[in-house]
């Protein structure tokens, strides 16, 4: 778990992580490889869902702008991924719902005002900036985004 989050944070793809596991097969043996894959599946990380393993990064439709009220934080499910969207007039931020600490999915219920708190280890984030404001030291993962035809799109 601890090495997985570090690998993903440093840019390793799901395919590269799986390749590394398989390369370790002669040393670790089948039982430990199966155990590691079970952990990956239990973590329910979108990158490791079978339909996403060989997918190339692409633009995904998040929502029409009129469904994202200014001054509010909206929780959306999009393309197999949960997102928090902050909109304040022309400022828009699109965040992955997974905590950067151990990739725990942060539910919508963890949002109080503009503060989002991970239920696992209580890392807290300011959704207006994405910065970690309590316990941890890494910001939320923010996705590149654009507005096209009055619709918010995000890239992953």
Model region roles, listed by residue range:
Residues 1-58:
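Hydrophobic alpha-helical segments
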Residues 5, 97, 116:
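Short alpha-helical basic/polar micro-motif
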Residues 7, 121, 145:
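Hydrophobic/aromatic pocket-lining and membrane-interface residues
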Residues 99, 118-121:
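Short cysteine clusters
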């Amino acid at each position: 778990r601890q090495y997985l989050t570090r690998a993903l944070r440093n840019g390793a793809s799901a395919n590269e992580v799986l390749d590394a596991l398989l390369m370790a097969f002669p040393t670790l043996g089948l039982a430990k490889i199966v155990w590691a894959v079970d952990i990956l599946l239990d973590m329910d990380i979108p990158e490791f869902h079978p339909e996403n393993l060989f997918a190339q990064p692409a633009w995904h439709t998040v929502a029409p702008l009129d469904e994202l009220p200014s001054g509010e934080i909206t929780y959306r499910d999009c393309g197999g991924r949960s997102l928090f969207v902050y909109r304040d007039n022309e400022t828009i931020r699109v965040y992955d719902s997974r905590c950067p600490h151990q990739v725990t999915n942060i539910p919508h219920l963890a949002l109080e005002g503009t503060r989002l708190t991970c239920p696992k280890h209580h890392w807290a984030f300011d959704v207006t900036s994405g910065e970690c404001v309590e316990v941890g030291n890494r910001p939320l993962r923010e996705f590149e985004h654009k507005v096209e035809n009055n619709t918010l799109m995000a890239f992953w």
